[in-house]
Structures are given as structure tokens and as C-alpha cells.
Amino acid sequence: MLSVLDQIGPAKTAFVLAGGGSFGAVQVGMLHSLAAHGISADMVVGSSVGALNGAFYAGDPTLAGVERLGDIWRGLTRHDVFPMSWRTVLSFLWHRDFLISHDGIRKLIDDHIPYRNLQDAKVPVHIVTTDIISGDSVVLSEGSTSEAIVASTAIPGAFAPIPYKNYYLADGAISSNTPIQVAVQKGAKRLIILPTGHACATQAPPVGAVANALHALTLLIARQLVIELERLDPGIEYFVVPPLCPLVGSPYDFSRTADHIDRAIATTDAWLAQHGLQQGMIPGEMRPHSH
């Protein structure tokens, strides 16, 4: 039986996953629904937490693989990803230029992503990072999987940049090049975009420096994606999986990940049932709004 995309045509399809901290759980639910409906990608482009999810998917682009990714997310705590202690805070105050160690992210990658180099993924994967000196994007498609993802998730100020050749790489969310542009540059003619969304139902700023930085990044990413889609060459097809709305919580809060996954599965199932993959449009949930 042909999938919806098979019926549309053979053009190269990219899954595009941007950042969003703990809201990356939303992408896991979206991937689950897409996989359950037999919808797959010819390439994956990821930035920030989307780099982590995209790289895992590229290693096992099956429903069983996405279910394993969901199990990982359901078991995550904030400390697993952002390992902080009084010692790290004091070290930051005295002599370090970063607040959080990369050890949490690195362990997550080493424990769960089965391939060590990007070029060994089952589906081509491209990781978007930012040269912290120039602001230019640096796209990694080969070499160490761990180093690429660690770099793409390195929020400036919270994590140290990663030295790479003549660059110092940081979070792909602040890049001059969005994952949408990268997917097109890599030859994709059809984009399926999996946004994490932003905390549109929040009533007050998050508590803490890292939480505020992540919240600001989710707002920036949402605006970037909308702008890029509005400027996209009309020859490129795109379909945006609607993010959760209303979305409660903080991208620094990992206590709601199971709910985010389950809601995203349900909303993506409904979107597909309503022929979402035949309607290229920017959902209102992606545009700036609040409740």
C-alpha cells in the first residue's frame, strides 16, 4: 500500500527538526505518529534538541525505533540533561565561562545512539550548529555524532562552545541558517517540519537563568521558522505538523514529557486524518500568540 507521500511523488523528503529544550518531547510524539502511518524521510536535518531527536531517528527510522526514543524521553529528568550542582555554580562564578557540563548530553548520546559517526546513520542526517565567533552556520554531515549533537545543543552561556577545526560551535538555534534552509540546500524538494512550539499558555516568565534562556530560544525559533517558510521558494513543498497548543510549562521542565508525547501523537494522528500532508500551510499555532 502506498503512503500519502508515495502517491504525491518521488521527490526527496526531509524531516526538519528545530530546537525547544524539553519540548523536544513533542517531536517524539510527531515522529511516532508519522512512523505509525508509514511516513518516512530521505534525510533528516536537526538543530539543538532537534539534532538529538533527528540523529536518533536516523539511526533507526522505524516505529519500534521511535518507541524506544519515547521510552528514553519518558525517563529523562532535568539533571540528566542539565547536570548542575553547587560545585558547578561556584566554579562558574570563579573561573569558568560556562554553567553546565556537557556530560549529561554526551552520556545520553553515547548510551542510546548506535552509530559513532554521522555518515553511518541509516538515513542521511545533517546537524546545524553555529560558529559562535561569526554567527555563521556550520552544518555537520560526517564525523563524530556525539560532538555534532553536543555542539548543536550548546546554549551560549550555559554550555561551553565546542572547538571544531577553526570554529567554536554552539547551539544551532542561533545560527544564520535555519534547518529549513539547510534541507533545501541538501536537495530536499519536500519538507515535513516538526516544530516543538513554545509555552503559549504560560502566565509568567520562567524561574532561573537557563529556563529563561530556553524560553527565549523557543520564541526565536518559532519566529525564524515562520519567516523562512514565508520566504520559501514556491517550488519547494512543505507541510508543518502543528505544535501543541495550548502548551503549558517550560522547556527546562522535564516533568511533563510523557504528556507532551501522548498529546503530540493524538494531534498528529488527527492532522494526518484531516489530510494535513496535502495542505501546505503555516499553522496558527506557530505564530506568536498567548492565552
Which residues make up each language-model segment?
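Patatin-like phospholipase
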Residues: 1-47, 55-291
